[in-house]
């Protein structure tokens, strides 16, 4: 069970927050809604989970109804836009009973006296739909998946070449997301893709491979960072495809730095509170044994002397020189039994205390301070006396890899928007604005990137709430209006759903 504890004080602050400032000041009643130079009669949205309305760790009907493309389409209908169809799932829980790993949505429940996000149990099987759908957002899709044939082939699900979310509504087993979008002959399109090309690496704690320089995505694993040229080429193929059916007008967005979202910013690096007695014990049993050895090896700063109050988590950093043999030899020469010396050397050869440059995954909360099976005290406490594995932490070097890839992606996306004459949404800049202490305000309600209390992000810490998607919808609307001289009104984020409390 995932246990992310939310204090009652935080809930009160969420429910009572107000502000005299607002970023939503236009009087909608005075706007004459027009399409300007655009034709909204057939709008198709391409993208990934963010486009589909995915939130709370699942795809469910109410979330889909509050997808940002659905909000945009609603405003387009006031300016000649047509119907906007979505491949709605059959329930408000999400997940699939017949596909392993696809759980139902997260909900807030009281666990041991604290509000905690807990996954639901899926109630529906993977359904197969017919017809065409304006919302072509596919959760989990990377840039190159949009142009991949067989991505909706049920036979490829076990091997990972197909995606069950596209299997649901693909027109055939051999089609691609792009081909099904083209078949609708759109007059206008939106494209927001690229997040997953780096996000899966980040949410896995960097256990994938940075594939920069490898332009063959068929060799990638699911948690790898996509080569920037592969991303740019895939997006160019999508844009050429849209142009080939006459959809020369549209809007494209860049991607936020994924490390700025609550999944990576909620758990602090110094999440270990110690009293005087426990700090002294750990200093004597662990730090005191290792730090002199590390200091002699010129690596004394790997471990910090523990203090009363908040202390850094102990992590494994695979970029560090492995000092297992040196630690083992030093301990043995100091009279430590051979078996214990070998264990300590192996366990702490690449261990260090986390710093503010490391990011702790939201899902790691349930692991910290748990016992490691088969390891004796005092060395068995995850993140305290036993180093957290790489999958639980983004180290500063991994954060840097993500930043470099994101910057490269965004440079290409901006250039492609200019080359194809499209409206451009700077989603990265909006995320930075949301991340500021003041957040942004809409009609007296403040939105930020804070987990749960910020109002923008859902319980999975990665995807948005209905209100968060409304904030994004407005960025698309503003970009469309600026480029095509349309007058689509913005939506009011406060009219959409946020976190639901029990």
Question: Across the structure, where does each feature detected by a protein language model lie?
Answer:
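C-terminal motif of bacterial Sec signal peptides marking the signal peptidase cleavage site
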Residues: 15-19
